Amino acid sequence: MKALVLHDSGIDYQTDREMPRLTSCFDVLVEVHFAGICRTDIGIAERNIPAKANIVMGHEFCGRIAGFVNGDDEMEGWHVGDVVSANPMVFSDKGDMMCGKECDGAFAEYIAVPHQALIKLPPYFLSPLGAYLEPVAAALAPLKHIDGRDRVCIFGDNRIAALTSQVARAMGHQHIERVTRLDALEKDHYDCIIETEPAHIDAYVDALKPGGLLILKSRSFAPSTIISNTIAMKEICIQGTRYGDFGVASHILAASAHGVKHTLDTSTLFGPVYELSDYEKAFTEASLPRNKKIFFKLCAE
């Protein structure tokens, strides 16, 4: 099958990659239709994020169930042909793993995942919309920590900041401000800051009120320098986030697909769709933070 595989020398486009083997843990075979390029994928490709060698990259995807480890057409309430995505954080007998980082991912014609990780999607999600489920779920994560806080800022001039801002609006958080420049941050001004650019931790702490909350949205592996005295004296809390509810993310995307106001404007979020063989151009475009989300189309359907 076609796949993008990580090697020490970079990304290798293969046309003869072996099909995934189903096991008792990775028990569902999914035919991938669309997959999105994430900042994590870029970091892995640039060797800034550690990842297992010789794995298929990618973790944002949608597709159809193609088979089960038991050889039947159904298993645990799932059926061959169901349109699905998956939570890329999978739990197996080898521990917690992330698709495209510790185990084979979605930049391929097929992916094997645990049935517990599947998220069922409506048929019209068999498009870039379905591959966008994981980013929306990730953008939901910080919002569960901001209730009751008056002044909330999302900082960043990048795709994830733009998405998080739109998801916050879709969830009814009208009081959230998006800031894209450091010089626009006011000292002791915010109750909460959601960061999407990890290089400016001290600036965020300075802009928070005493007792404020800093939510870490980015997943950088680069070391960050902080002045702990300021954090201690201002009694700042730091909160990490991973994912919100994938079901809620699906509802947000469905609402945007049906033109519901105050949801997501995918025209400002979705960029071009590339064939897997055009991966070099796709990754180059995706590496520019202000550019829209870039997708691969894997299936001819």
Where are these regions (language model features)?
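Glycine-rich beta-strand-centered segment in the early N-terminal region that forms part
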Residues: P20-A35, E46-V90, P122-F125
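Residue-level marker of beta-strand positions
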Residues: D27, E60, D82-V83, Y110, ...
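C-terminal hydrophobic helical "lid"/dimerization subdomain
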Residues: F246-E301
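Cysteine-cluster motifs in flexible loop/terminal segments that predominantly coordinate metals
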Residues: C38, M75, S85-Y110, P114-I119
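Glycine-rich phosphate-binding loop and adjacent beta-alpha segment
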Residues: H200-H258, L298-E301
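Mid-domain Rossmann-like dinucleotide-binding core that forms the NAD(H)/NADP(H) cofactor-binding site
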Residues: L126-K187
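N-terminal Rossmann-like NAD(P) cofactor-binding module of classical short-chain dehydrogenase/reductase
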Residues: S85, I193-I194, I215
